[in-house]
Amino acid sequence: MKRQGASSERKRARIPSGKAGAANGFLMEVCVDSVESAVNAERGGADRIELCSGLSEGGTTPSMGVLQVVKQSVQIPVFVMIRPRGGDFLYSDREIEVMKADIRLAKLYGADGLVFGALTEDGHIDKELCMSLMAICRPLPVTFHRAFDMVHDPMAALETLLTLGFERVLTSGCDSSALEGLPLIKRLIEQAKGRIVVMPGGGITDRNLQRILEGSGATEFHCSARSTRDSGMKFRNSSVAMGASLSCSEYSLKVTDVTKVRTLNAIAKNILV
């Protein structure tokens, strides 16, 4: 498939899937839920995209249409979220079939990597399910997402992910944000000893990125870097909401902010280069 719309502001060779230590000393992953946000992330200097839908729910599987157009629009690697719904990470047999089908389709439409996670009812990594999904993902690299933050024993869970063959784990340190979970993130990185990438994520902004990177020793980080912009709609029916909450207006849109991505990029370069 021929790619179109490559960023004119930052032309570069395609980056490998994501071993820690990119050519510029760090790796920034931006989670996005639209083509516009994907393009903005690349323009701002992101090294990799995590493509999702439903970011307000923590990220769910995007449509294959979005994936197809994103792949036509950016040159940086696109890792695709495989999560059939919001909520917990304990999946039914039918949900598992959906996840398997989505992995196959994501590979067909050009995903550079996959992102998923699954737990047992007692808060352990679901080894059997993960092995089954990993077999379908091969040879693509796989990230275990923030289901990790819901595990019973994070240190033991990290070793489990290593044995299963995950390339990285995304975590807020089992806390409300990466800043709050910084002590555990540091311990996880020390335990990993480079065998698996421990990638901080959750509430990362220009105000706390330096502290998180310096305090953890991480060489990759995950952020959304979004801003809210007003809808272009002129006629507005403010008494109707499409979602469950009136706090989420149909007339304000959250998109990745090029300036925010550039700022985070500059902070990380200053620390790690």
From Swiss-Prot:
Partners and quaternary state? Homotetramer.
Give the UniProt subcellular location, in the record's own words. Answer: Cytoplasm; Nucleus
Q: GO molecular function of the protein, one example?
A: copper ion binding
- What keyword terms does UniProt attach to this protein? Copper, Cytoplasm, Metal-binding, Nucleus
Q: Does the keyword Cell membrane apply?
A: no
One BP term from GO:
copper ion transport
Q: Name one Pfam family in it.
A: CutC
Q: Which family does it belong to?
A: Belongs to the CutC family.
Family annotation (InterPro entries): CutC-like (IPR005627), CutC-like_dom_sf (IPR036822)
Which GO CC annotations does the UniProt entry carry?
Answer: cytoplasm; cytosol; nucleolus; nucleoplasm; nucleus
| Broad class of the protein's primary localization | cytoplasm
Report the function annotation for this chain. Answer: May play a role in copper homeostasis. Can bind one Cu(1+) per subunit.
- Describe what happens upon changing C31A: Reduces copper binding. Reduces copper binding by 75%
Q: Does the keyword Nucleotide-binding apply?
A: no
* Protein name from the UniProt record: Copper homeostasis protein cutC homolog
User: In which tissues has expression of this protein been reported?
Assistant: Ubiquitous.
